[in-house]
């Protein structure tokens, strides 16, 4: 058995309107801590065109329908919650789950303001791989 590092990076730019109905963007990801050792999600968020902060939430995917309906989030316990113009942080989940990374502009006081947000997500983990799987992969690539 070998343990191989894995890295997956997503770079996006979103235009997120204000308001409750469409003032957010959701990126889904899944983590299986049995297969993905030392998983971490690093993220770098930057509001490009505004002096008003954006909110970043990480929720369980099953909480998303309730979050969309609930304006104050009081019934939902997020795994992560932070506001800012620039957010550079790391999320290390403690349980395997399907997660939702939410860029939230629903609280914006300016109803017509569309925020341009640069989002860089980097998923890192280690995975145990059998030697035979490596050899088979090398054969198919060559």
Q: How does the language model describe each region?
A:
Residues 1-142:
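Acidic, Ser/Thr/Pro
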């Amino acid at each position: 058995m070998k343990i191989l590092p894995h890295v997956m990076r997503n770079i996006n730019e979103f235009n997120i309107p204000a308001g409750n109905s469409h003032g957010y963007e959701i990126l889904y990801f899944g983590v299986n801590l049995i297969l993905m050792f030392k998983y971490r999600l690093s993220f770098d968020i930057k509001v490009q065109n505004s002096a008003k902060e954006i909110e970043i939430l990480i929720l369980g995917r099953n909480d998303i329908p309730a979050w969309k309906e609930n304006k104050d989030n009081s019934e939902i316990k997020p795994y992560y919650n932070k506001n800012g113009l620039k957010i550079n942080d790391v999320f290390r989940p403690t349980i395997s789950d399907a997660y939702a990374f939410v860029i939230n502009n629903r609280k914006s006081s300016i109803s017509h303001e569309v925020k341009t947000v640069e989002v860089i997500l980097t998923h890192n983990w280690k995975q145990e791989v059998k030697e035979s799987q490596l050899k088979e992969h090398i054969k198919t690539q060559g």
